[in-house]
Amino acid sequence: SFWSYFQNTYLCDSPNYNCRKTNLDIFSCRSEREFYDAFASAVLKQTSSKLEEWMENARLFLSRISPKISLGTEPMTDFSISLELNPKAADVDDILQLPEKIAQKKGIDIVVCIDEFQQIAEFKDSKAFQKRLRSVWQLQKSVSYCLFGSKKHLMNELFEKKSLPFYKFGDTVYLPKIGTEDWVDYICGRFEATGKHISAELAGKICRA
């Protein structure tokens, strides 16, 4: 895996630092609109501690977009947002500014972690989309972005190609492959956490598959 990050994301690990993490996987996003829906849902869900709070934030900060919210059996964790987007840049900016506005309202810092970030290269008019993201994100004061990807060559292109908007957006870190022994320990531990058992030998076969 590979990631590029912006600002001091490690501060969130300090118990004395008032910071909230938001995690988002965009592997299944196939368009700019799907990205905005997933982005808004993740930010609202993971920065709010109760249903009323995230609904209030949606009303306050996304009112021009008329968000449609679908609730599941567990409203705090099972909901999705569909945004009635207009082509106006201001409407899109409202979505991209959502974590910054929530951070300022709550007096906290937020780190938005986006996995499989290389997917944005597949969007229609991707370069224009990348320009929009960077133009908004680089001016935010209370939000940092940790951008992960599993396709090293695509991530390299996004962040190292001079003609693309995310060129030198942040520091770049390459992660080494996870060792088989660590994978085996992790797999066995996850099985045990659910009351099940798997032998180290079988876990090793899974790693080598």
What are these regions (language model features)?
Residues E201-A209:
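A short helix-loop-helix "switch/interaction" segment in the helical subdomain of ASCE P-loop NTPases
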Residues F27-S31, F117-Q119, S150-L154, I178-E181:
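Conserved nucleotide-binding/hydrolysis micro-motifs of P-loop NTPases
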Residues K101, K105-D109, E192-H197, G204:
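C-terminal alpha-helical "lid" subdomain
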Residues I81-K151, E160:
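Conserved Walker B catalytic segment
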Residues S1-I110:
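P-loop NTPase nucleotide-binding core
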Residues L175-L202:
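Conserved small helical "lid"/interfacial subdomain of P-loop NTPases
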Residues Y10-S14, W137-Q140, K162-S163:
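Active-site catalytic pocket residues across diverse enzymes, especially alpha/beta-hydrolases
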Residues Y17-C19, F159-K177:
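A short helix-turn-beta junction within AAA+ P-loop NTPase domains corresponding to the substrate/partner-engaging
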